[in-house]
């Protein structure tokens, strides 16, 4: 949390249920802009968004963009992000790489990027997702901001691979 608040990158290796989500949720509420949370599962994104909305009077505080949304729902998300209501925007790596989303995010003040389930980056990991390998080049295209990578499962080899790729 301290690293993010001071504009530095962070790597978090913490057991399931240990509070990894809080490591990016708390700074997102304090910092200017919107935090981009890269997450591999639609169900996980929905749960996180629902949990954040339950704690806020502002329903636009958290959103996700993925293939399950209609055009009008995506427009609503974008309006909330542009108006400054949204502090957390969850995206799958596949959505992050879409040109229309890259162009949109280039016009947004991003506080930081959170890479949840970061072990998916590593070829050495059990849940390797090739799209995760493209996160750093996409961030370079969208705009620089601190990165926090979070995982519960990473051998030293996987940890090194994550840090090297981000």
Residue ranges of predicted features:
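Post-DEXD/H (motif II) to motif III coupling segment of the RecA-like Helicase ATP-binding lobe
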Residues: 106-166
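Pre-Walker A (Motif I) flank of P-loop NTPase domains
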Residues: 6-12, 32-34, 85-87, 145-146
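Conserved catalytic network of the ASCE P-loop NTPase/AAA+ motor domain
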Residues: 28-30, 54-58, 79-84, 103-108, ...
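Conserved helix/coil segment N-terminal to the catalytic DExD/H
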Residues: 18, 25, 50, 69-112, ...
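ASCE RecA-like P-loop NTPase motor cores
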Residues: 2, 46, 50, 75, ...
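Conserved pre-motif I regulatory segment
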Residues: 1-15, 23-26
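Conserved Walker A/P-loop ATP-binding site and its immediately adjacent core
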Residues: 22, 33-55, 67-69, 73, ...
